[in-house]
UniProtKB/Swiss-Prot annotation:
The keyword rRNA processing does not apply. Belongs to the phosphoglycerate kinase family. Pfam families: PGK. GO terms for molecular function: ADP binding; ATP binding; phosphoglycerate kinase activity. Substrate binds at D19, Y20, N21, R34, H57, L58, G59, R60, R115, R148. It comes from the Bacteria. GO terms for cellular component: cytosol. It catalyses: (2R)-3-phosphoglycerate + ATP = (2R)-3-phospho-glyceroyl phosphate + ADP. GO terms for biological process: gluconeogenesis; glycolytic process. Signal peptide: none annotated. CDD domains: Phosphoglycerate_kinase. Keywords: ATP-binding, Cytoplasm, Glycolysis, Kinase, Nucleotide-binding, Transferase. This is Phosphoglycerate kinase. The lineage of its organism: Bacteria, Thermotogati, Deinococcota, Deinococci, Thermales.
Length: 390
């Protein structure tokens, strides 16, 4: 993989694909983590004498939509990098090209949301060529988007000398440790809504791990597959056989699987709703399990004791609606308390929990990519990485 150390930026206009897909509310950025993570790469290039053109997406707009403008991101970036300014032009436009060509060394230009361009997600060759006119070299530092074969990730990388930024390098180094000779015992904690989102990563990691802890709504598909009564909890009915098969494979490989023993349940998902605790395999209708229960929190903390490598992706409950955030926070605390272990967390809600607890420094690596980290652990590479190796 070509890295920033292979690039002499002096006097060059460098096109950088960053991941500024951050939460924005009332025109203000709510969490600047991804902006801060991009700064080492940007400052390195500026110190080397480059001018920079930045590309990013925000949300999933269906074409130009002021709600998804990168203007608030430009404002937040400026607070950390005064050289930066936002230009409200789609990156494939003539205006964007003129703005880019007028840059002087030391200047930074953030262009409008790449997803305002109709060809972005189709990896349109013509759009990729228009992006390529914006710079003389390309740096991919958007790990959170590196699993998407889009024009601003893969298309343009084939048309310019392409390099991995520092964040990309850091992510690949940390996640590779989870695949190559991880220190044992190795525990994986998976949560979130769907088994189908995690099948690939479970299949890839099963031969490498010792313990698998499953929480979140995806646990109910496993519990029902084992004959449990799960009330109105979310279940992927078409994945029951697969869930059973995965449990059988885990047993054959000597992997200990931990499923919830009890759950916090309610009749509907809303803050302050009346909750009950039930055994995880005996949830009566009309209740649905919305978080792991107190016994499970203790059992999961015990299951993590002594682990030397831990990967965590996905919440243990409906994290965004208190009190169903408590299980996720408890798991975050249990992992952070491990001494001498290499711990990695990825995925929006899991990372949000770690940040809310103020425990980021206690983790070996906090990944900026949820889907990207899962795909990397499943396949050992990503579309965005493959073009940097070409």
């Amino acid at each position: 993989m070509r890295t920033l150390l292979d690039l002499d930026p002096k006097g060059k206009r460098v096109l950088v694909r960053v991941d500024y897909n951050v939460p924005v509310q009332d025109g203000k950025v709510q969490d600047e983590t991804r902006i801060l993570e991009s700064l080492p790469t940007l400052r390195h290039l500026l110190a080397g004498g480059a001018s920079l053109v930045l590309l990013s997406h925000l949300g999933r707009p269906k074409g130009p939509d002021p709600k998804y403008s990168l203007a608030p991101v430009g404002e937040a970036l400026r607070a950390h990098l005064p050289e930066a300014r936002f230009a409200p032009f789609p990156p494939g436009s003539e205006e964007a090209r003129r703005e880019a060509e007028a840059l002087r060394p030391g200047e930074v230009l953030l262009l409008e949301n790449v997803r305002f361009e109709p060809g972005e997600e189709k990896n349109d060759p013509e759009l990729s060529a228009r992006y390529a006119r914006l710079g003389e070299a390309f740096v991919l530092d958007a790990f959170g988007s590196a699993h998407r074969a889009h024009a601003s990730v893969v298309g343009v990388a084939r048309l310019l000398p392409a390099y991995a930024g520092f964040l990309m390098e850091k992510e690949v180094r940390a996640l590779s440790r989870l695949l190559k000779d991880p220190e044992r015992p190795y525990a994986v904690v998976l949560g979130g809504a769907k088994v189908s989102d995690k099948i690939g990563v479970i299949e890839s990691l099963l031969p490498r791990i010792d313990r698998l802890l499953i929480g979140g709504a995806m646990a109910f598909t496993f519990l029902k597959a084992l004959g449990g009564e799960v009330g109105r909890s979310l279940v992927e009915e078409d994945r029951l056989d697969l869930a059973k098969d995965l449990l059988g494979r885990a047993e054959a490989l000597g992997v200990r699987v931990y499923l919830p023993e009890d759950v916090v349940a309610a009749e509907r998902i809303e803050a302050g709703v009346e909750t009950r605790v039930f055994p995880a395999r005996a949830i009566p209708v009309p209740y649905m399990g919305l978080d792991i229960g107190p016994k499970t929190r203790e059992a999961f903390a015990r299951a993590l004791e002594g682990a030397r490598t831990v990967f965590w992706n996905g919440p243990m409950g409906v994290f965004e609606v208190p009190p169903f955030d408590e299980g996720t926070l408890a798991v975050g605390q249990a992992i952070a308390a491990l001494e001498g272990a290499f711990t990695v967390v990825g995925g929006g809600d899991s990372v949000a929990a770690v940040n809310r607890l103020g425990l980021k420094e206690r983790f070996g690596h906090v990944s900026t990519g949820g889907g990207a980290s899962l795909e990397f652990l499943e396949k050992g590479t990503l579309p965005g990485l493959e073009v940097l190796e070409g």
